[in-house]
């Protein structure tokens, strides 16, 4: 394996990943001539590497766009665009802002080494964070070029990690001895492997087969629908979804004739929810209005139960809708999903424990499910990929025991110097979340404001997690959906921008906030570049 050290890298900033977050980071750090390492041969991230024939965006186009780049076509179309349209949009964004010249495709980052001042820290230091561009390299980055095995080393002052929480590392369930996939005589694969299949390969895999899909989140729902559609007509077999935990889903963004944003995405609606750093009086206020929040949740649940046959199939969650929204667990149910269930092409089996046997799956109640193909839609472990390239002791400090990375403003890890993270915080619009954090990070790198001490940054993160923990049992993720506007306000205040982005009070109070609200005016642009 060849290896060489590239001391001629002209950039001071490296960006790892060219998905949505990587593109947003590159565009906002363009004046630093960043080097963007992307393992694949094009931009798009998970939208290119892991999509199915039926995959669509979970929102309308206007709710998934960059602040300074509206959708060029069909922007006002309220339907959810398929993944090919999203890829085209992301590619157009990269070309419009001339970002491709910064890209190094076919370049997989396999290791980063700390080469900052002195020895690698062995103890937690809660003092000042330090300069993000100190004038000399802080990290060495090892990059594998294509399939050649050649390794190049580059040195940078600042590294932005944009591989995201999904990454390309599948989360595989653990099984007791002699009860794992090796016992099964059929085909076992993760959803990540399925989405790499060509259309004809996928159809051949599913058609006429007894398919079991493990999971009940977005990927699992898409896969079950895809299996049902591949088995239409004579000889078609039903797909069975193995469900451990049910979550609320909605058919569209209207509830009893009212737009969904009225309930969670306006200042008025989020005012009813707890937020970090709130006063005692505000805590008391939120406690008093907890009944109103419960009424809102029940109101939405009543519509979902009327519109979708969750009770018919035993899929009604035993927790509130608000819990799923507060932990970013809500999904949009495809319009023909339950149509296929009513036709008998999608079936459901609830079980918290299961394992393999020769013919299929055994459940904890002793029943069995025969299968030809088992697809594990059990999620991804993007942080495992991150841990593989980050050295100690930073690897140990990377996440808390809960599994959540302690990121200040969702971007800076207080214990890891000169490294930013974009795409690891969730909200109702992950593109908007990533873009705003990229804007904030750019101003931070440009020294437009200073970070507080590491201790204060960790304290702020803990307060955010406390809000999520008090709102939902599914708190092991950094989700800001119920206080996203206040989170954006804090970032605007850091950047010296007016956090109130609407033209009048009524819009400020009752209209939704999105990426277009954070498009910089001419005066703001001049202030930012001054």
From Swiss-Prot:
The role this protein plays is:
Required for the establishment of systemic acquired resistance (SAR). Not involved in local defense mechanisms. Confers a salicylic acid-dependent (SA) resistance to virulent pathogens such as P.syringae pv tomato and H.parasitica.
Output one GO MF annotation. flavin adenine dinucleotide binding
What is the gene name?
FMO1
**Highest taxon of source:** Eukaryota
Detail which positions bind FAD.
Answer: 17-21, 38, 46-47, 58-59
Q: Which organism is it from?
A: Arabidopsis thaliana
Q: Do you know which Gene3D superfamilies this protein is assigned to? A: FAD/NAD(P)-binding domain (3.50.50.60)
Q: What name does UniProt use for this protein?
A: Probable flavin-containing monooxygenase 1
From the UniProt annotation, give the residues forming the signal peptide.
Answer: none
Question: What biological-process terms (Gene Ontology) are attached?
Answer: cellular response to hypoxia; defense response to bacterium; defense response to fungus; L-pipecolic acid biosynthetic process; plant-type hypersensitive response; response to other organism; systemic acquired resistance
Which InterPro entries did the record assign? Answer: FAD/NAD-bd_sf, Flavin_amine_oxidase, Flavin_mOase, Flavin_mOase-like, FMO-like
Arranged from A to Z, the UniProt key words for this protein are:
FAD, Flavoprotein, Monooxygenase, NADP, Oxidoreductase, Plant defense
Which Enzyme Commission numbers does its entry carry? 1.14.13.-
